[in-house]
Amino acid sequence: MTSQLHKKGEAWSARFSEPMSELVKRYTSSVFFDKRLALVDIAGSLAHAGMLAAQKIISADDLAAIEHGMAQIKGEIERGEFEWQLDLEDVHLNIEARLTALIGDAGKRLHTGRSRNDQVATDIRLWLRGEIDRIGGLLNDLRGALIDLAEQNADTILPGFTHLQVAQPVTFGHHLLAYVEMFSRDAERMRDCRARVNRLPLGAAALAGTSYPIDRHAVAKTLGFDGICANSLDAVSDRDFAIEFTAAAALVMTHVSRFSEELVLWMSPRVGFIDIADRFCTGSSIMPQKKNPDVPELARGKTGRVNGHLMALLTLMKGQPLAYNKDNQEDKEPLFDTVDTVADTLRIFAEMVAGITVKPDAMRAAALQGFSTATDLADYLVKRGLPFRDAHEAVAHAVKICDARGIDLADLTLDEMKQELPNVAHLIGSDVFDYLTLEGSVASRSHPGGTAPDQVRAAAKAARAALGK
């Protein structure tokens, strides 16, 4: 019985008196999703083998055989020729079994001084580190596309909103740079997360470390880790880094979702501020006229998906005692899907933003509605000595009158304005209308962080310089 089990390749089979149920095999196997870790698994194994040889734990001949066998396996995987076996449960045992088949006993010595517990923790960190770097690049691409569009629209005026009500005029460039700020913070979070990802668990073995004279720091250096995990129990059981990454990814998607909501609104014929290129839209199977912004709509939906993965990982870890538990097999699919979703979304959004057509006339027309320069009139009165609360009340009265007449504040004549605001008439001169123009309103906010066109250009320049950091 034992020899038959060994032929099937189960690494623990000598301990049991009956073979594993086929149902249990399918239930516990992870190879058909964790095989994406194959190349980092090979990299980790080669670093481990090199250290074992340097420490005289395995021979130089064994190391040479392992390196030769791993090169062949890597080629098979890259060419799609590797035969993954359900019986071998996961990526680690599949590769080890193939290595042993190729090089014999030297392959059996590879696992000396390590466990799959520290092996998989190392693989995930190696893989995620690379994906964080990729996502950082994609965030830069999206930020760059937004900066380009912002620079092109530093003078384009649209209404700024609070509570989805017209508030004050802003430049479209300023509005876009708000999203650049969000995605810049996302990039910072990814960099911060990477620092905690980049610690080596290998050497912790199953949970207690190993009795072999290993050199963990040498392996860390070979694999590009900043250091080692300091506690063997924590090293094999920690998934904080995966949760932290997924939380950062959820914020990326939240920012994408907020932007998506505005894109959908702006593209609506009732608003008509922008048009999204046809290649990013779909039509209707029944309504011939439709052009639907499916990409931003789907991004809103996918945000819920990533948020769900975050909750799944938090829930996965909340009841686990030290050290490693099989529960942790469930960390990979949420993590993999989060990476795929965020990367795909960022890539398509960078391309979509570059293809947006802006409609400045529609934006300007909307900014002329809703008394968007009312605050400027109040500020005008304050600068002439009126307390702000009194100015606020006077302008609110003027807005009420104009609203009833269906006109804007700028449509009043000077005499009408003085007549409607007798208590402040002595403060109002003909220059008041300079404050009521959209251009005057945005130009007056020329301070760092303000919406004035000169500040938008300066902010865009600074944001572009930050892309390389």
Curated annotation (Swiss-Prot):
Keywords: Amino-acid biosynthesis, Arginine biosynthesis, Cytoplasm, Lyase
The EC number(s) this enzyme carries: 4.3.2.1
GO CC, alphabetical: cytosol
Subcellular compartments: Cytoplasm
Broad class of where this protein is predominantly found: cytoplasm
Catalytic activity: 2-(N(omega)-L-arginino)succinate = fumarate + L-arginine
GO molecular function, one term: argininosuccinate lyase activity
Lineage: superkingdom: Bacteria
Pathway: Amino-acid biosynthesis; L-arginine biosynthesis; L-arginine from L-ornithine and carbamoyl phosphate: step 3/3
Example of a GO biological process term: arginine biosynthetic process via ornithine
Keyword Ribonucleoprotein: no
SUPFAM superfamilies to which the protein is assigned, alphabetical: L-aspartase-like
Sequence similarity: Belongs to the lyase 1 family. Argininosuccinate lyase subfamily.
HAMAP family listed in its UniProt record: Arg_succ_lyase (MF_00006)
Protein name per the record: Argininosuccinate lyase
UniProt lineage: Bacteria, Pseudomonadati, Pseudomonadota, Betaproteobacteria, Burkholderiales
